[in-house]
Amino acid sequence: MEPPLKPIAVDFDGGKLTSDGGVLLLGLADKNIRLTERINAIIFDPRNPLYIAHQQRDLIAQRIFAIAHAYEDVNDHIRLRHDPALLAAVKNTTDENQPLGSASTLSRLENRITEKEISELNKLFVELFIESYDTPPTQIVIDVDATDDIIHGNQEGGYFNGFYDNYCFLPLYFFCGGQLLWSQLRTSNKGGGFGAVAIFAYIAKRLKKEWPDVEIVFRGDAGFYSSTLLWYCERHGHKYILGFSSNAVLKRMSANIVFASEMFFVENGSQEPFRLFREYLYQAGTWKVPRKIIVKAERLPDKTADCRRQTTAEARRLYRISCCRLQTAVCRLL
């Protein structure tokens, strides 16, 4: 039986317009996973309920939905608080006599959130990730990356970062596929991998508790390499594949494969990139045991042969994972 048809009224009088109709889909998605409701349960609201005009959950939804539509600044809400689509998504109304929270109200909300509550919010992302699976996965590949968040003015905690050549924060992100697992705001005077081991340890422990048989793979570039991370992964049975900075020993070991890729490219007159892979057993001075190093020598048409190295616990299979999804975390940050 077909559902009854609903009348649709169209007029061209102008009236209250919006260019952000997609926010209505966010509102429906939020009702499904109860994200803003669960965030609201984490953040303590010290206000007297007798003297407030806006529920904290509505303020949270207002801020999140706006950021998702590229309205990052609180000042944007001077106008957005009257936007009919945002009103409908947040409060299920388009009544202009019931505007959303002001910029100052949202600013006070953001500034009263504690570090403990932020940690609990990140744990919520892990729970949402677990809930997204109907059946236990056999393997989880966790990507980690950091990016620059340029500061404006004299923001507290702003430092100059030589790599990004600017004053910025250096937030840390953990992803699995298209899902965010953790987002940690950090000052940029720390190393790229600062705090990564502790966060990964929490995520891995929680996933193992839910799915005891799942295989967990940690994947990151050379900035996240540390002997502590290798020790943790190997002790707890997790796989890893990490970028590895070159040194004189590794350059000597990989000289033949670099030369071979160059010669093959030249002799065959190829105009396509040519790659060779080789696996070595290498033991750094601080390592108690040797580990596998995978070397990729790549010759591009307009460049000489380039060489990249990664260390891993299980070379061939895990490197295929890396080759297939090498840019996953980077793409999530664009």
Report residues per predicted region.
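An anionic, glycine-rich sequence signature occurring as long contiguous blocks
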Residues: 1-8, 242-334
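Dynamic "connector" segments at or just before major functional cores
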Residues: 1-166, 170-190, 196-212, 258
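Hydrophobic "anchor" residues on beta-strands that sit immediately upstream
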Residues: 141, 217, 239
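Acidic/histidine-rich, metal-coordinating catalytic segments
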Residues: 145, 215-224
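Acidic, His- and aromatic-enriched active-site or binding-groove loops in soluble protein domains
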Residues: 162-168, 235-250
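Short, electropositive alpha-helical surface patch
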Residues: 201, 232-235
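Short, surface-exposed connector motifs at secondary-structure boundaries
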Residues: 209-216, 235-237
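Catalytic cores of alpha/beta
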Residues: 227-231
